[in-house]
Amino acid sequence: MKQTTIAKKVTSVGIGLHKGEPIRLTIEPSSENTGIIFYRSDLGISFKAEPKNVVNTQMATVIGNQKGYISTVEHILSAINGYGIDNIRINVDANEIPVMDGSSISFCMMLDEAGIKNLDASKKAIIIKREVEVKEGEKFVRVSPSKSPKFDYTIKFSNPIIGTQQFAFEFSRKNYVDEIARARTFGFLKDVQMLRSMNLALGGSLENAVVIDDNKILNPDGLRYENEFVRHKILDAIGDLSLLGAPILGDYTAYAASHDLNHKLTLAILTDAKNYEMVSIDEQIAHEYAKIFA
């Protein structure tokens, strides 16, 4: 199985969640073994999508260095991971990825327009060899060996609109588009009002998030899935784990987790070489993990 990139450059413009200003986003083909590269065209600096370049995980995943950063990378990374794309360059002219509609479906549409191109080098994957878990109180994230990789996530909120939700998702590109990609980010009206008082979330609206006010959803069209909230958490996790640089061949399980716990999990996996094996995907591995590469 070969590494992939996109076949052509595609550009879109969307609103930044925090500043509320238009952001120009361009995805471009990239050569084999380069991975996912973010480029700040306004600053002329770039960052590779990898755990060591994560600089903040409060409310979003932020990558960068001393010269600059890009916030809210998890949704576009989720789409790229969902589509199994190994090498791509992402250009933005601001310090955040546009929020689009709050899900990853707009990025999926950009990838569909760009098309997927095979490269010469062999595709790589990370086989999870033993269980790795990160816990903080009752919250946890965990990966474990599995021949049919899935994401199993449980959330628990005191708000009755969300409550306790659990969803298990068997990873494949088709399942990603059908079951995960349209799930939007969500928040509470009181939190949005607080953030705006801090000059943040200026681009947030009912057009790009599910907003909850006490016991009701403010969006006129309601939810896209009955359990859209937990599905979006899986969307985020798929994006956060893509920072490992290759698809994970193993199960991911989470309870009340966060971007921060996901980041700590990626670091924990890489800390000990006994936790995983980086492999080139030959016919045997492709057959063993047939569902993920369907």
Swiss-Prot record:
Transmembrane segments: none annotated. Pathway: Glycolipid biosynthesis; lipid IV(A) biosynthesis; lipid IV(A) from (3R)-3-hydroxytetradecanoyl-[acyl-carrier-protein] and UDP-N-acetyl-alpha-D-glucosamine: step 2/6. Zn(2+) binds at residues 75, 232, 236. It catalyses: a UDP-3-O-[(3R)-3-hydroxyacyl]-N-acetyl-alpha-D-glucosamine + H2O = a UDP-3-O-[(3R)-3-hydroxyacyl]-alpha-D-glucosamine + acetate. Its EC number is 3.5.1.108. The active site is at 259 (proton donor). Catalyzes the hydrolysis of UDP-3-O-myristoyl-N-acetylglucosamine to form UDP-3-O-myristoylglucosamine and acetate, the committed step in lipid A biosynthesis. NCBIfam families: lpxC. This is UDP-3-O-acyl-N-acetylglucosamine deacetylase.
